[in-house]
Curated annotation (Swiss-Prot):
The modification N6-acetyllysine is found at residues 144, 149, 158, 276, 316, 322, 370. The keyword Transferase does not apply. Residues 412-433 are annotated as: Leucine-zipper. Efficient DNA binding requires dimerization with another bHLH protein. Binds DNA as a heterodimer with MAX. Interacts with TAF1C and SPAG9. Interacts with PARP10. Interacts with KDM5A and KDM5B. Interacts (when phosphorylated at Thr-59 and Ser-63) with FBXW7. Interacts with PIM2. Interacts with RIOX1. The heterodimer MYC:MAX interacts with ABI1; the interaction may enhance MYC:MAX transcriptional activity. Interacts with TRIM6. Interacts with NPM1; the binary complex is recruited to the promoter of MYC target genes and enhances their transcription. Interacts with NUP205. One of its GO terms (biological process) is G1/S transition of mitotic cell cycle. Transcription factor that binds DNA in a non-specific manner, yet also specifically recognizes the core sequence 5'-CAC[GA]TG-3'. Activates the transcription of growth-related genes. Binds to the VEGFA promoter, promoting VEGFA production and subsequent sprouting angiogenesis. Regulator of somatic reprogramming, controls self-renewal of embryonic stem cells. Functions with TAF6L to activate target gene expression through RNA polymerase II pause release. The lineage of its organism: Eukaryota, Metazoa, Chordata, Craniata, Vertebrata. InterPro entries: bHLH_dom (IPR011598), HLH_DNA-bd_sf (IPR036638), Myc-LZ (IPR003327), Myc_transcription_factors (IPR050433), Tscrpt_reg_Myc (IPR002418), Tscrpt_reg_Myc_N (IPR012682). Keywords: Acetylation, Activator, Chromosome, Cytoplasm, DNA-binding, Glycoprotein, Isopeptide bond, Nucleus, Phosphoprotein, Proto-oncogene, Transcription, Transcription regulation, Ubl conjugation. Residues 314-330 have a biased composition (Basic and acidic residues). A motif (UBR5-degron) lies at residues 354-363. This is Myc proto-oncogene protein. It comes from Sylvilagus floridanus.
Length: 438
């Protein structure tokens, strides 16, 4: 049943209705028109009554007021359970001094300070109703909790001594009212650890705070376990949020621990953030992967540039190039053997080295052959000024030119022989003439 309290003085209208507002109007057969006719001249429209009948509490609960006043839910509950006056009316029969004295006695008692305010280990205070169910726990539940505390306090007050009248002083009552308002705010607030119960910088299991300030507003371990089990997203993954690696399952973590012993080329790039933290154990594995893509890029050479039109006899004309090729091949083979002895290489790496060596030697052979063709072209009179002459034309013209030169040589040699014979004849004739004259 809702709590209806009215004060004669110092009434705060902005919080009274919210603090005592019920979930529904309990009496479903209540005649609103008859009540309105008794208080007002004209009844309200039926639509207003319908919406007022089904009016709910605001969800989520409103933030508590931070100002000191007499309209907090705890004080309303205190006033509602206080002894009523002789006239049988509401709380309006009490004066302001009596109300302040009751609140001061409630907050100043030793039992209340130990069990309700200053005892953070109390299970009743830790397991707050608002924290257990923050959606539908209204002020009636908070008033019920205060009433239970008040009943136990009144039972213990009979045995204890009465408080001194000096506590009804104005300054003390103001501070006690402010503490009462803060106490009401603490009971109505929601702990942020319920929304996100996992710590960001603690890799171990979640522990409750050790300080009394934080423990007073933190839920118990049972409530944390129940919230973790009930939530579908609860998993041990968020417990390692401080690490740099992404959250993985237990099977993945076991596989990564086994893979750290044997590091291959494929898995190094996948576990690069973790190997950076490890340091020296994975230093040898990081040197291989950056070089392998570069080797593949450099070894990609098209094979359609070979000179298939050149006759096989041209290689016999250039024994120096072939000798250099064989020598460089031996040197590179020795280098590859030394590397193989120093560190075991895979078959792919060996094939890449062989392909790279072959490409270098083939490029050198083509360059030397091109320079030879250019030199031969310059010796042919017909192709001396033709820079775009193909290699086949150069070879044909060179062959014809060589044959012509050889024929010319034979002709000149025969002519030389004839001239030598003529000379010999002339010499012999000259000798005969000298002998005849003598």
């Amino acid at each position: 049943m809702p709590l209806n309290v009215s004060f004669a003085t110092n009434r705060n209208y902005d919080l009274d209705y919210d603090s005592v507002q019920p979930y529904f109007y309990c009496d479903e057969e209540e005649n609103f028109y008859q009540q309105q006719q008794q208080s007002e001249l004209q009844p309200p429209a039926p639509s207003e009554d319908i919406w007022k009948k089904f009016e709910l509490l605001p969800t989520p609960p409103l933030s508590p007021s931070r100002r000191s006043g007499l309209c907090s839910p705890s004080y309303v509950a205190v006033a509602s359970f206080s002894p009523r006056g002789d006239d049988g009316g509401g709380g309006g029969s009490f004066s302001t001094a009596d109300q302040l004295e009751m609140v001061t006695e409630l907050l100043g008692g030793d039992m209340v300070n130990q069990s309700f305010i200053c005892d953070p280990d109390d299970e009743t205070f830790i397991k707050n109703i608002i924290i257990q169910d923050c959606m539908w726990s209204g002020f009636s539940a908070a008033a019920k909790l205060v009433s239970e505390k008040l009943a136990s306090y009144q039972a213990a007050r009979k045995d204890s001594s009465s408080p001194s009248p000096a506590r009804v002083h104005g300054g003390c009552s103001t501070s006690s009212l402010y503490l009462q308002d803060l106490n009401a705010a603490a009971s109505e607030c929601i702990d942020p650890s319920v929304v996100f119960p996992y710590p960001l910088h603690d890799s171990s299991s979640p522990k409750p705070c050790a300080s009394p300030e934080s423990s007073a507003f933190s839920p118990s371990s049972d409530s944390l376990l129940s919230s973790n089990e009930s939530s579908p997203r609860a998993s041990p993954e968020p417990l390692v949020l401080h690490e740099e690696t992404p959250p993985t399952t237990s099977s993945d973590s076991e596989e990564e621990q086994e893979d750290e012993e044997e590091i291959d080329v494929v898995s190094v790039e996948k576990r690069q953030p973790s190997t950076k933290r490890s340091g020296s154990p994975s230093a040898g594995g990081h040197s291989k992967p950056p070089h392998s893509p570069l080797v593949l890029k450099r070894c990609h050479v098209s094979t359609h540039q070979h000179n298939y039109a050149a006759p096989p006899s041209t290689r016999k004309d250039y024994p120096a190039a072939k000798r250099a090729k064989l020598d460089s091949g031996r040197v590179l083979k020795q280098i590859s053997n030394n590397r193989r002895c120093a560190s075991p290489r895979s078959s792919d790496t060996e094939e890449n080295d062989k392909r790279r060596t072959h490409n270098v030697l083939e490029r050198q052979r083509r360059n030397e052959l091109k320079r030879s063709f250019f030199a031969l072209r310059d010796q042919i009179p017909e192709l001396e000024n033709n820079e775009k002459a193909p290699k086949v034309v150069i070879l044909k013209k060179a062959t014809a030119y060589i044959l012509a030169v050889q024929a010319e040589e034979q002709k000149l040699v025969s002519e030389k022989d004839l001239l030598r014979k003529r000379r010999e004849q002339l010499k012999h004739k000259l000798e005969q003439l000298r002998n005849s004259c003598a």
